[in-house]
Amino acid sequence: MKRIGFIYGLLFCLVLSVAAQEKVVKLKIVETSDVHGNYYPYNFITRHEWKGSLARIYSFVQKEREQYKENLILLDNGDILQGQPTAYYYNYIDTVSPHLCSEMMNFMKYDAGNMGNHDVETGRAVFDRWIATCDFPVLGANIIDTSTGKPHLAPYKVLERDGVKIVVLGMITPAIPAWLSENLWKGLRFDDMEETARKWMRIIREKENPDLVIGLFHAGQEAFKMSGKYNENASLNVAKNVPGFDIVLMGHDHARECKKVMNVAGDSVLIIDPASNGIVLSNVDVTLKLKDGKVQSKDIKGELTETEAYGISEDFMKRFAPQYETVQKFVSKKIGTFTESISTHPAFFGPSAFIDLIHTLQLDITGADISFAAPLSFDAEIKKGDVLSLIHISEPT
């Protein structure tokens, strides 16, 4: 009888030992991209409620963190510093207070960010100040300091979650010189994404030995050469041609995408893009099975999630109510009066008071001899009456 009890006890211990060596880890990866200043669920230009925003995104994040706790990884993929007066005000008007964007992202507890071309377009004084006040690293493996030949920003971030090592590699579209004047990015250069990815993947594998590698790329998937030499949207090329990535989070092109592709090594890579303005977010579930601390299998599933369905975070709105009121006052300030309404529509057929105004302003402000301007919108209108400072929308590339 004692012998039988001993055997059962031994078997029980063996089962416990095996169970202790095997482990399942579940991660939730959330990507935002191309938020374009849509921090609040309100469009300060149209003066209407907005479907997207960080306020709605945070409501989703709060709910998911109840389940995933620290295993939720929150990442931003750039182009967050331009698009609404909220960004403009803290970029150029109030440069003394902490930048609203970094305050919000710190409050939301982002794990890493990435640079986008519209962030670069704000100028080094703005984006360097923003980066300095972020509690998380803003990445840029292919943004090179020309004086040192080294990345101006951290190339990647290592995250440890529940015994799993995750590496996030950040890159930006290298086509910046095709759009932006050098005075905005003086002292920097933007290297090819695929070449940069090969270099850093080798370093990451040798130095970090990660269990999961995420590409955080401010670039779309339709590759073509800008100005004959800049491969603007190389995310798909990197996913396919540089083995090692499990997930590639995309941005820049404002195009929704979620699919798996096969790389040259025969491995599956999830590529996903949440488009723009915080209307949807990239929602990725990763399940890893570990044995003796080593990953035996990975299951990666992604979907695009509409943020409107999750409502607006009351905590977020309460925390940033004073800044909301500050921006409202700014955009409500009268800066002039139009005695007649003007529209872009006539510009497509002949003389246009709207385009004449743009030419006059460009010539007067810059001192240029010649002004070029395009209507861009077919039927944009400035109506007769007072003009408010909400006209400051963006500094478009």
Annotated model-derived regions:
Residues 1-23:
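Bacterial Sec-dependent N-terminal signal peptides
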Residues 5-8, 28, 392:
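Residues marking helix boundaries in flexible regions
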Residues 21-307, 349-355, 359-361:
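Acidic, metal/ion-coordinating pockets
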Residues 29-36, 173-175, 325-337, 389-390:
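Short, compositionally biased low-complexity segments
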Residues 32, 366, 397:
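Ser/Thr-centric signal marking residues that sit
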Residues 224-230, 382-389:
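Short glycine/threonine-rich loop-to-helix capping motif typified by GTGT followed
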Residues 287-387:
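A short C-terminal boundary segment appended to hydrolase-like catalytic domains
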Residues 391-397:
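Residue-level detector of conserved catalytic or cofactor/ligand-binding positions
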